[in-house]
Amino acid sequence: MSGGKGKGGKGKGGKGKGGKASAAVEGAQQSHSSRAGLQFPVGRIKRYMKKSVQNKVRVGAKAAIYIAAVLEYLTAEVLELAGNAARDLKVKRITPRHLQLAIRGDEELDTLIQATIAYGGVMPHINKALLLKVEQHKKK
């Protein structure tokens, strides 16, 4: 018979039946986000999901992780494009205008995010018919 410390027979330390060696301090708590390798708060998203769904509907743990991962990816994508827009305009701070330029400049994000961005301005656009008239005047 083993040492009598549960199914694994090894107690709390070392490599138990789970297959992972305990490298961290014993009993150290790890957040859902750090376990999933995310920055967005998985626990908070799960709490919001549980609060907003109908009664007697269960929310799986992986659902909150998936939503957090999608939100983190979309946020990183928008911030990267907005940072590029800010850098093109030679400024160091991302403003709502840069967010507007980034979202409306990307076709997929434009269809996904159809909200009006406050202080975002409008997209620069000149009709091609007007451009042709200007070019014809220059040729004369």
Swiss-Prot record:
Signal peptide: none annotated. One of its GO terms (molecular function) is structural constituent of chromatin. PROSITE patterns: HISTONE_H2A. Residues 1-38 are annotated as: Disordered. Acetylated once deposited into chromatin. SUPFAM superfamilies: Histone-fold. Residues 7-18 have a biased composition (Basic residues). One of its GO terms (cellular component) is nucleus. Keywords: Acetylation, Activator, Chromatin regulator, Chromosome, DNA-binding, Nucleosome core, Nucleus, Transcription, Transcription regulation. One of its GO terms (biological process) is heterochromatin formation. The modification N6-acetyllysine is found at residues 5, 10, 12. InterPro entries: Histone-fold, Histone_H2A, Histone_H2A/H2B/H3, Histone_H2A_C, Histone_H2A_CS. Variant histone H2A which can replace H2A in some nucleosomes. Nucleosomes wrap and compact DNA into chromatin, limiting DNA accessibility to the cellular machineries which require DNA as a template. Histones thereby play a central role in transcription regulation, DNA repair, DNA replication and chromosomal stability. DNA accessibility is regulated via a complex set of post-translational modifications of histones, also called histone code, and nucleosome remodeling. PANTHER family: HISTONE H2A. This is Histone H2A.Z. It comes from Yarrowia lipolytica (strain CLIB 122 / E 150) (Yeast). The gene is HTZ1.
